[in-house]
């Protein structure tokens, strides 16, 4: 576990299966966050390309935890899901999921943690807008979902597409209360 200061620890879980062309940029985008109290849990989910070799290049960083699964475990595999394995290894009070072909803007976590600090303690999840980036022609499109308020976390877990998948930052206790027994979380 890595904790640089007294700010709450944020764990970012990165599941990876055959994304060797993107994984380095993905991991680096978390390590370059302006919010410094982070740990990165990278799960190589049985990749058959060079993903694991690229992930291992980050093993020198104390903020990075690497989990190697010998074979691919698909979502919804119950107690053996890659997300559940990573969640159980994480130490953060807040959990984010970043897919291996995506990346964060440098101040994403800082802005979300600032928002948490301004909200009532009953708020369990905050999310943000994002961009869709098309590498082939180097274009980006702002991607916004409608705003939700109230007790939406259970619906978020069940529906899985209420917000941009990589945008939520969730209090650990929400996962512990709701559980990890669905397709999205395993």
Where are the predicted features?
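Conserved donor nucleotide-binding strand/loop of the catalytic core
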Residues: 52-85, 89
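Conserved donor NDP-sugar-binding/catalytic core segment of glycosyltransferases
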Residues: 107-141
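The conserved acidic donor/metal-binding loop of glycosyltransferases
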Residues: 99-103, 129
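A conserved acidic beta->alpha catalytic loop
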Residues: 29, 44-53, 71, 99
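N-proximal low-complexity "stem/linker" segments adjacent to membrane-targeting elements
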Residues: 1-31
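Acidic helix N-cap motif at the loop->helix transition within catalytic regions
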Residues: 21-24, 49-57, 107
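Conserved nucleotide-sugar donor-binding catalytic segment
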Residues: 147-186
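Short aromatic/hydrophobic "clamp" motif used to bind/position activated sugar donors
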Residues: 95
């Amino acid at each position: 576990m890595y904790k640089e200061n007294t700010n709450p620890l944020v764990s970012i879980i990165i599941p990876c299966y055959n994304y060797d062309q993107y994984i380095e940029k993905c991991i680096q985008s978390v390590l370059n966050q302006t919010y410094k109290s982070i740990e990165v849990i990278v799960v190589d989910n049985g990749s058959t390309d060079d993903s694991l070799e690229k992930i291992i290049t980050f093993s020198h960083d104390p903020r990075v935890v690497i989990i190697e699964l010998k074979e691919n475990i698909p979502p919804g595999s119950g107690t053996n899901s890659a997300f559940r394995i990573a969640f159980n290894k994480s130490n953060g009070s807040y959990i984010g999921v970043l897919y291996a072909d995506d990346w964060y803007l440098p101040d994403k976590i800082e802005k979300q943690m600032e928002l948490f600090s301004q909200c009532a303690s009953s708020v369990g999840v905050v999310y943000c807008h994002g961009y869709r980036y098309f590498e082939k022609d180097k274009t980006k499109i702002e991607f916004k979902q409608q705003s939700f308020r109230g007790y939406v976390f259970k619906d978020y877990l069940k529906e899985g597409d209420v917000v941009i998948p990589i945008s939520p930052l969730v209090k650990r206790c929400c996962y512990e209360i709701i559980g990890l027994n669905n397709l999205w979380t395993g």
